[in-house]
Each structure stands twice: as structure tokens, then as C-alpha cells.
Amino acid sequence: MAERLGLGIIPGVGWRAKDIQAIAREAEDAGFDGIFAAEVNNDVMATAQLIGAATRRVAVGTWIANIYLRHPYVCAQGAALIADAMEGRFILGLGVSHPPVNKALGVDMGDPPAALRRYVTAVRSWLKGEGPATHLPQRPTPQPVPIYVAAVTSRTVELAGELADGFMPFLWSAARVEQSKAWLQRGRAKAKGLGKVDISVGIPTYVGDDVKQQREVARGNLAVFTGFPFFQRLFRASGFGPEVDQMERGAGGAALSDRLLDAVCLLGPLSRCREQLAAFRAAGTDLPILMPSVDVDGARALIKAFRR
């Protein structure tokens, strides 16, 4: 099977609907196999619809849909309709987002892994036509809707192995991807009727001849994540304790050491990026999702660099 490659976009400030669709078409024409949209300053389900309408071949996914923002019934019915319109190309990525995000929206997260378990179970039940009846009988979705789950801790990775078709880590090193396979297998041992877990890793990607310059670009783009407790926990578990100490003191992007960036990103000349990508694949990544700089031009440059 040919190696797959995905593009991740963050259609926040500066993106218009026409930009989302233009980038989607360009990525499809360049040979990418999937296009995934983050839920940042947008409705990710609506964004997926835009991408699906602009493309014909690629998989289209949410990366990820925040479970606290939609009732599972609404999520399932929306996913079913999108998958039907795309004739089975849709991937429903689900996750709990982050405490600072949900707090700003007035959301009480409770126990996130438990909430994620209930949500995935409910969504899958409605997709099968087995959810609680409303005023009309339920029916199975006409197209399959694979469910992928975002994961940070070993507990959520194991949950993904038990309940999901795939899992979507972000800011993981290749070494942690390798480590995660045992956690996935523990979860899969409890699963019923599910095939192999598809490991789709989101990898920030910054292509340019000057490695130092690209690291600075990465620091600027990724600084916001240093204030998220879940990512701080991830980085500490991945062997970056001193960096996390700086993050907890509010250092922002300055806390992202060269060593950390080189572990979780592809950056530098294209040849170096390809070598780093090969390491992620060797560790078990089935579908790398390359995340460019947040603006439209960054997405366009990445598409051009990785054209196949």
C-alpha cells in the first residue's frame, strides 16, 4: 500500500470559506490523501462540509471536534449527513479539547476520559441506528463514519484502542508514537468488531533552508500550546521536564527547546523534513498529518513542498 499523507489546517483568523476550499483543492491536486481541519475559531463540522464540497478523492476529517460543544445526537446526525454527501470519505475526529479553551466557553469538563467514553459510545450507537428514539425511528447511516480519538495520556490512548477506529495525537515525538502501540494494544484487546487502529499523527511542519530560522517560526506558531496543561503533561512524560518547568513559569515559545522542536516537528530543508517524517512512519504512524504555519500562505507553501 502506498504511504499516505495528510494536511492539517487551522482555519482561524484570516481564513475565508473560499480560502479553505482553494487550499483543499490544491492539496488534493498535489496528491495528499487526507485534509483535516482543526476546531479553532470555526465550526469544524461546517468546515469539513466546505472541504468535502471542494474535493472528490481525499479523505476529509475533523481534527478534532470538541465533544463538549455538541450533543452526541447532533454530532452523529451531522456526521452521517456529511459522510453521505462525501460518499464515505468523512472521518470524525473527536476529543475533549483543553481546559483553557473550555473554561473560556463556560464548559465544565468533569472527568474528560469518562466524558469521552460516553460520547464516543453514544455517537457510534446513533450512527448504527441504535440510539434512543426521538420522534422518528433511528436508522443506520448510509455511509460508514470512522471515529478517531485525540489522545494525550496512556489512559486516553488505551480508550482509543478500545472504542475508536483511529487515534489522533498531536505534538508527539516518534519515540512516544512507538511507545503508544502497547497502550493501543491493551485497549484493542477489549474491543468488539474493530480492525487495526489507524495512527494519524499531527506534525507541525516548517520547510526552509535555515534550520534556526524555521525553529523560530515554530516557536511563534506553537507558543500558545505551552500554556495548555494537557500538553505540559505530554511534554513532561516525553522527557522534556526542564522545558515544562519554563512553560509553567509562563515562558511561552521560549520554552520550546531545539531538542523538543526537533522531536515533535518536521523543520528545515525538505530533505531533513523527509528524514524526520520517515522516523515517524518507522515508529508506527500510518497517516502523518502535516500542520503548516497557521496562515493560508503557509498551507500553500507546504502543499508545494510535499507535492507528489
Question: Where are the regions a protein language model picked out?
Answer:
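Active-site-adjacent structural elements that line small-molecule/cofactor binding pockets in enzymes
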Residues: 1-308
